[in-house]
Curated annotation (Swiss-Prot):
HAMAP family: GTPase_EngB (MF_00321)
Protein name: Probable GTP-binding protein EngB
Location of the EngB-type G domain: 26-200
InterPro entries linked: G_ENGB_dom, GTP-bd, GTP-bd_ribosome_bio_YsxC, P-loop_NTPase
Binding site for GTP: 34-41, 61-65, 79-82, 146-149, 179-181
Gene Ontology biological process terms from the UniProt entry: division septum assembly
Function: Necessary for normal cell division and for the maintenance of normal septation.
Organism: Vibrio parahaemolyticus serotype O3:K6 (strain RIMD 2210633)
Keyword Cell cycle: yes
GO cellular component, one term: cytosol
Cofactor (UniProt): Mg(2+)
Amino acid sequence: MSVKIHYQNTHFITSAPDIRHLPEDEGVEIAFAGRSNAGKSSALNRLTNQKSLAKTSKTPGRTQLINLFKVEEGCHIVDLPGYGFAQVPVEMKNKWQKSLGEYLQKRECLKGLVVLMDIRHPMKDLDQQMIFWAIDSRIPVQVLLTKADKLKSGARKQTLLKIRKQVETFGGDVSVDVFSSLKGLGVDQLRAKLDTWFAPALAHLIEEDDLEMPESNEE
């Protein structure tokens, strides 16, 4: 028996400038990370079937806070600050990167990382750094090659195979799939992945359901 996760009920809880200002380190958190133009906000909105859960900005790099969303009791999604935008001051970039690294390496309830990257410009240095931080902390990673609708089917498959082959050399638990917020491509696969990562936090609900099931009258 499993508990159905209602992603459409996801709602914003709080923002924090760094890990020290986040709520208690408990339950299960899944973090979303990506370059400032990777389509992270659009992906979160598509995942939850909401138009403005995550605010999209026409000024990449503007979001400097860690944003926390509640999916179910004990299940949270964390929207990490976008990284790698050229027009952001170096001092601010360094502060963000320190905050991201600290979160990935020290947050005990972090059980999965989704790294989003534009399928036309995948695996930049900072993308790889995020993945390696997660691998070092034994956190599974789901890479989403976003804006997949921008490529024709053949080019899309070619890029997917190339990146999958590349991550095989990384070690760790790293999966790669294509994704399109516009077309809905890869949304079901993403939800299935998150379901498995959130499962430990929902185990007590499954146990309660089993206890409440009526006994069979069959002899």
